[in-house]
């Protein structure tokens, strides 16, 4: 359903019939484009780099939204003792997908700047596979903290899709600059 307005626009502008092919994750999107199963894909920054490498530099970017120029992530938790990134040492933690720029790569970079190595400093590191799944993992207590794209967090919060009664809060928001 999310793709319908784009499909309608492309069909109107090109006169072509557009078929939407859903994929399960970022890696599947990369493989679909590289193996010419699809003609176009929507990627984040990190996934675009993966596709460019896998394709032998044959992937061409055609559009970028204004908000894609900057990446901001939020770190979330239900633990009231966690107030800074340094307080995350020793917790169970979830990133989103391993191929997510704002759900993995950028949060990992900001953790490193704060002197935190997830493999050494977290009790356990998980990958939820998606931004909303990270919220669900923190909300259910599967992990003590997690990181996700700020726009997804804002949308979930606005639409009341943050699990009720979990008291999930944001102790840290990353800068849009490294």
Question: Where are the model-predicted features located?
Answer:
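N-terminal, post-signal-peptide region of Sec/Tat-exported proteins
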Residues: 4-38
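Loop/turn elements at helix/coil->beta-strand transitions in domains of secreted/extracellular proteins
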Residues: 16, 37, 57-59, 90-91, ...
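Bilobed "Venus flytrap"/periplasmic-binding protein-like clamshell domains
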Residues: 1-13, 23, 46, 70-136, ...
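Generic structural signal for residues in well-ordered beta-strands
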Residues: 18-20, 125, 168-170
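Ligand-binding "clamshell"
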Residues: 51-63, 156-171
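Periplasmic-binding protein-like
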Residues: 66-74, 161-178
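Short beta-strand-centered segments that line the small-molecule binding cleft or hinge
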Residues: 39-41, 49-50, 58-72
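Beta->alpha turn/N-cap motifs
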Residues: 22-26, 36-54, 147-156
């Amino acid at each position: 359903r999310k793709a319908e307005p784009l499909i309608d626009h492309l069909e109107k502008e090109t006169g072509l019939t557009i078929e939407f092919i859903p994929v399960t994750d970022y890696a599947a999107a990369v493989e679909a484009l590289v193996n010419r199963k699809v003609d176009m894909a929507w990627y984040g920054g990190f996934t675009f780099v993966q596709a460019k490498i896998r394709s032998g530099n044959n992937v061409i970017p055609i559009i970028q939204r204004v908000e894609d120029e900057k990446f901001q992530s939020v770190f979330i938790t239900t633990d009231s003792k966690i107030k800074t990134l340094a307080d995350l040492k020793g917790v169970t933690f979830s990133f989103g997908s391993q191929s997510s720029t704002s759900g993995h790569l950028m949060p990992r970079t900001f953790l490193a700047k704060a002197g935190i190595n997830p493999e050494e400093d977290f009790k356990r590191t998980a990958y939820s596979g998606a931004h909303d799944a990270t919220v669900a993992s923190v909300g259910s207590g599967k992990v003590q903290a997690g990181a996700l794209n700020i726009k997804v967090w804002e949308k979930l919060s606005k639409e009341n899709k943050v699990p009720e009664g979990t008291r999930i809060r944001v102790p840290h928001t990353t800068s849009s600059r490294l």
